[in-house]
Amino acid sequence: MTGLAGIRRIIPHRFPVLLVDRVSEVDPGSSIVTLKAVSGREPCYADPDVGDAYPLGLLMESWAQSAVLLTRWDDPNPDVRSGKVELISGIRDVVVHGDVVPGDVVEHHVRLVREVADAAILAGHSLVAGRKVLEIGSFTMARRRAEELA
């Protein structure tokens, strides 16, 4: 099991954008299971007119960070200004099964479908208390040198 310190050594995300709290299982090059505890104190809930549902974009970003953790597990890059940076190049077959609300702990399951050169295809789902809340049929990520993106 890996906590925040270990996660920070692998990917460049930091508060308030780091949306993974713990890695509970990992099979490098194959699959990962991560946890994200949703709190009512997160910046997305600062507006009093916001409802209880955790924003879908943040839920998907949390899943995507889990995907980056899997692909970077054996080749960490905690500095987004150097080395290669992961970019989302496509997401398909997304199905939302229900809301996530403060107090929920989201369990992201990500599996590597294929990896070639500077690209990876992943798929998976997210659970809350054993209930599926999100499915991602295909998530494609590309890696580019940070210097090329400046």
Task: Annotate each language-model stretch with its function.
Residues 12-19, 102-107:
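Short coil-to-beta-strand transition motifs
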Residues 72, 100-150:
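HotDog/MaoC-like acyl-thioester-processing domains
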Residues 1, 68-107, 136:
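Hydrophobic beta-strand-centered segment that forms part of the acyl-chain substrate-binding groove
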Residues 2-14:
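Short aromatic-glycine motifs in intrinsically disordered, low-complexity regions
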Residues 15-54:
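Catalytic strand-loop segment that frames the active site of acyl-thioester-processing enzymes
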Residues 47-70, 88:
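Compact, glycine-rich, soluble single-domain proteins
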Residues 21-24, 92, 97, 111-113, ...:
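Conserved positions in beta-strands of structured domains
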